[in-house]
Amino acid sequence: MRLLTLFILLLSTLYANDKAHSFAPSEDCKACHTEIYDEYYTSMHANPTPQKDPIHGAVWNKHPMNNKHDRYSCGKCHTPAADNLDDMKTKGKKAPVVMDNPTHQTGISCAYCHRIESIELHEIHNTNIISKTEKKYFGTLKDNIDSPYHATATSGNEHMANGNVCIGCHSHKKNKHDLNVCSTNIDNELDGANCVSCHMPKVKGSVSNMKERKEHSFHGFAGSHFHSDMLTQHVDISMLRQIDDFIINIDNRTSHSLLLHPLRMAVLKVNVTRDGKTTKLKDEVFVRVIGHNGKPAMPWVASVTLKNTMIQANEKRSVKYDFKIQKGDRVDIVLGWYLVNPKAIKALKLENEKVATEFNEFKKESFTF
């Protein structure tokens, strides 16, 4: 009986954990961290809810947790500062994500990320452990100044120090069929790479207006939605001319696939201009399609990967074109992506959403012979 009581108390503590957490609004950070707040405000971290992200909204509109259970089961990572996060994570509870709740629409708030004390690694998905000390934030600047608003801790936090504080949400996510729906498969030791070094590079501007500094870590979180130009240095495009054809090489020098979400579709577009006339060659498509019973399916239904031609971590992909290059030809190459595979647009009713239908140019190269 005593062991049973202790077990129940332990469960109560675990599930009540989020109720012990309340987070300062991100707007509070703006007064001192003006540049960082402006970057954050336009990022996906500030706009991850169904009401603010049309693509996520379209997927959520089809989700059984929305239509049958009225519970925002994505809250653990999309609205982690929600005042009813416990209910969002608890089977049988009703906990929708609503527009008029500021703790929902603040998304992945400044205070939430900077209170991640440690990360528990799990097979299904990882879990962020949040410090119970409000207004004590983890950072990396050793010569930080005392803030009148909050305390700052710069030691004793492994994940903040090694730049992989993101893996609580961005490492992997398995569904009920044991399918890894979305995964970075990150190798933390790879050439010293980490999440922050690529997605939060150093940019000009001070961390705060209380002490002038030359640079800070970018808080717009470069990715497939925004600021992808910051990532072009990590992918190289080269061309090899042969006698009767040519090869384009795409060298992905990152520690994860070129695109991670199964909705995405990368495309290599190639045009050859000769004597003022441009010939468009066939697009090369890179995708990862998940599905069930042989057909593409939503992430909660999918049980297998049906197709995977996505460029993988540290892969140099070669694409051959049966086109003979002549002297004076110019070859224009564009590598980019659709945030939603065009084949899924109609099913998700996203025909009128520019963010879903437009082609995002990532990197361009031109070669003249």
What are these regions, as identified by a protein language model?
Residues 190-192, 197, 201-369:
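Short, conserved sequence motifs used for protein processing/export or organelle targeting and
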Residues 3-14:
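Sec-dependent N-terminal signal peptides
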